[in-house]
Amino acid sequence: VARVAIAGSTGSIGKQTLDVIRSAREGEHQVVALSVNSSADEVVAQARMFKPVIVVVSDKKAREKVARELKTTDPKIEVVAEPEQMSVIADVVVNGVVGFAGLSVTMAALKNGKRLALANKESLIAAGPIVAPLRKIAGAEIIPVDSEHCAIHQCMRSSHNQSRDVQRLLLTASGGPFRGKNLESLKNVSVKEALAHPTWSM
């Protein structure tokens, strides 16, 4: 049984992870921890369904609400403030936390020698030099699970030349505010235009 901790369990990645676990063979995975910032009602429903050992809630008011609600139905579930505990009890940590807030989850998982299913790109972009040495800890492993970096990972692992070191990767933008623009029009792009990146529902 793989013990799974899900940081950002009420976000897109977290919900998809729970869907996969729900549809897997019974006994294949056990959700041992769920983590949210402030989505109290959603995480209470998830906790009642998956019966984790701990629920991490960053926001104090939301944490108090979650603790009250679970105390009546699931008193064995511990409600805590810090996400670091998750990686101690899990075999696999899914990091679906948005932004720089996900760095502590990434670092704790790797320091504890866990497999990290990483959707939080900011951990590597903003703190790559800090995170990279942690990969050398026995058992520590990063598996990219979101969008482009997962696709690259799969391509590299399926290549007949996978033993060779990759010297350079080029990622092309498939969308964004400048899709369809010609080179001449890109010369006068403003900061405001560059920041107007489209978003979509996952």
PLM-predicted stretches and their roles:
Residues 62-64, 123-127, 149-151, 176-178:
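Short gly/pro/ser/thr-enriched loop/turn and capping motifs at secondary-structure boundaries
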Residues 58-59, 119-121:
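Short beta->alpha connector loops at strand-helix junctions that form conserved
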Residues 66, 100-112, 121-140:
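Rossmann-fold NAD(P)-binding glycine/threonine-rich loop
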Residues 16-26, 45-46, 124-139, 155-158:
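Active-site-proximal loop->helix
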